[in-house]
Amino acid sequence: MLFFSFYKSLVGKEITVELKNDLSITGLLQSVDQFLNIKLKDIKVNEEDKYPYMISVKNCFIRGSVVRYVHLPAEDVDVETLQDHSRLEAREQKKQNKQHQEQTNQKSSNTTTTTTV
């Protein structure tokens, strides 16, 4: 959820999305969802001569699984806050994993196996 929250803070900013098929699209971030699907408006394709069919497109929806990179303006990225939140999320994940492991161990110790000969 870290990146989802981070991208939500960038709504309204201009970003460049590079797709796995080498298409790069620049536009204003309109919305992003938990799957990191992205909606851009007022888009511009970086290599219009290579993708002439994209010239007339003004808005687009990009499925998160086809994104290779997202280029962000440096002034909009607060590295310290991002590092703090990633550490916090890692700690919470570690805590959840430990609790899950303890529950699994308790369940396995409570079950007994009987064999008949």
Swiss-Prot record:
Protein name: Probable U6 snRNA-associated Sm-like protein LSm2
General function of this protein: Plays a role in pre-mRNA splicing as component of the U4/U6-U5 tri-snRNP complex that is involved in spliceosome assembly, and as component of the precatalytic spliceosome (spliceosome B complex). The heptameric LSM2-8 complex binds specifically to the 3'-terminal U-tract of U6 snRNA.
Family membership noted in the UniProt record: Belongs to the snRNP Sm proteins family.
Compositionally skewed regions (Low complexity) per UniProt: 102-117
This protein's record includes keyword Ribonucleoprotein: yes
Gene from which the chain derives: lsm2
Region (Disordered): 83-117
Alphabetical list of Pfam families matching this protein: LSM
Gene Ontology MF terms: RNA binding
Lineage: Eukaryota, Amoebozoa, Evosea, Eumycetozoa, Dictyostelia
